[in-house]
Amino acid sequence: MKGLFLRIITALALLFWAIDMVFPWQFLRHTEENHYTAIQARGSLYVGTINNQISYFINKDSERGFEYELAKAFADTLGVELEMKIFDNQEQLFDELDKHNIDLAAAHLLYHPKNAERFQIGPAYHSASWQLAYRKNENRPKNLGNVKKDIYISNNLALEETLKELQKQYPQLTWKRNQALTQEELLLQLAEGKIPYVIANSIDIAAIQQIKPELAIAFDITDEANVHWYLPNSPYRDLQTALLNFMNNAEETGLLDNLKEKYLGHISQFDYVDTRSYMNAIENTLPQFSPLFEKYKGELDWRLLAAVAYQESHWNPDATSPTGVRGIMMLTKNTAQHMKISDRTDPEQSIKAGSEYLHWLISQLPESIEKEERIWFALVAYNIGLGHLIDARRLTQNLGGNPDNWLNVKKNLPLLAEKRYYSQLKYGYARGYEAYQYVENIRRYMNSIVNYHRVQENQTTNDNANNESAVKNLEEIKENKD
């Protein structure tokens, strides 16, 4: 009897040991499957991001941005809808990721060992560094040891860890972490001279410089680091595997390159004098012509039409070139006759004709070119003629590229000026390098208008919120006194 009792106790112990060994694995596996299934069941992928001109923004009531488009493509591969969750800073974003309130964090987030310990990371898809920004015409510090005034950073604990390491080399280094303002808002305050220094992501600084040329870069405080999406730190292997496969495919198909070209390609070019002149023109000259650009935009974004006009004439209705093109859209006599206008120096006639001519050029393009890219091809034709655009597409195909892909054709435009290439083309020599720069300038000018107005609207919204808060506080004070 005693032996039977011992055998039962031993068997139960072994059973409990087996459950203890197996159950956690079963639980984790169940949790993993539940999470991935939950995304499918709810029919939505929750992606957290930060509202700025690169990652995510609203344009004409539509969601836009590098991270938005990439996340939308990922959601499509999962067969679910995308729901973006917007946060002010990285710590808010990571806190929600920690709580599993979002499935992914995507906001051009740099790699940091602390974050890698806290979360799982997706494949690298870009790179950036942390830079010290200061206001142009102020003294430029050579290193952190020369910084004598306050350095501001947004709410980013990983960046603080980096600064603590640098503090060992520069003991006098101090900084202020602002939890109320976004990184973009800090950079805007720096541009206005309200604060002396900001440490920010190199991508965000380059983007803001396009509308705030007063911003200048003192130096990089870190080497370039990879940019990743982050996932919650639990066994999300199905989602992580799907993300890995998606990113590999995005690299192979050119999706990543196309998004980098669309959202980051223009910010690498920065000229202080040109940008300062342009921003002055946006503030002082554009308002008198913007109603006409909106009136005659047709299927185009009016801000693109405005950007073309600035590239052509700097919004000068009386502009005339040595070759005889005239007006705010710089039309030739032949184009004016084709578009049936009588006075090229009349802004309304010129803008109407320029828009109609661009629409006509777009209609001449093959349907195989994606809708979103057709305008860039049309602008090349606007600049150097439809024949030379045909040559550029043919040359791209001959060189093994895709003649319907703007990124492929764009890089071959300068070859139209090289004899070994143009001698084999139907329409011969063309200043393709000028057409290349022409389109790049227009894209940059258009994005600057979009982001100038976006920043203005955000500031107005914030001012209104502050005013409402102040009024509420006064009312509460009055009630307390009564």
Curated annotation (Swiss-Prot):
Residue ranges the record marks as coiled coil: none
Segments for region (LT domain): 268-482
Region feature Disordered, mapped onto this chain: 457-482
SUPFAM superfamilies: Lysozyme-like, Periplasmic binding protein-like II
Sequence ranges of Polar residues compositional bias: 457-470
Catalytic activity: Exolytic cleavage of the (1->4)-beta-glycosidic linkage between N-acetylmuramic acid (MurNAc) and N-acetylglucosamine (GlcNAc) residues in peptidoglycan, from either the reducing or the non-reducing ends of the peptidoglycan chains, with concomitant formation of a 1,6-anhydrobond in the MurNAc residue
Superkingdom assignment: Bacteria
GO BP terms: cell wall macromolecule catabolic process; cell wall organization; peptidoglycan catabolic process
Compartments reported by the entry: Cell outer membrane
PROSITE patterns: TRANSGLYCOSYLASE (PS00922)
Keyword terms: Cell outer membrane, Cell wall biogenesis/degradation, Lyase, Membrane, Signal
MF term (GO), any: peptidoglycan lytic transglycosylase activity
Region of interest: Non-LT domain: 19-267
Compositional bias segments (type: Basic and acidic residues): 473-482
Membrane topology listed for this record: Peripheral membrane protein
GO cellular component: cell outer membrane
Enzyme Commission number(s) of this protein: 4.2.2.n1
Enzyme class, broadest EC rank: lyase
Main location: membrane
Family: In the N-terminal section; belongs to the bacterial solute-binding protein 3 family. In the C-terminal section; belongs to the transglycosylase Slt family.
UniProt xrefs under NCBIfam families: PRK10859.1
Function: Murein-degrading enzyme that degrades murein glycan strands and insoluble, high-molecular weight murein sacculi, with the concomitant formation of a 1,6-anhydromuramoyl product. Lytic transglycosylases (LTs) play an integral role in the metabolism of the peptidoglycan (PG) sacculus. Their lytic action creates space within the PG sacculus to allow for its expansion as well as for the insertion of various structures such as secretion systems and flagella.
Domain notes: The N-terminal domain does not have lytic activity and probably modulates enzymatic activity. The C-terminal domain is the catalytic active domain.
HAMAP family membership: MltF
Descriptive protein name: Membrane-bound lytic murein transglycosylase F
Gene: mltF
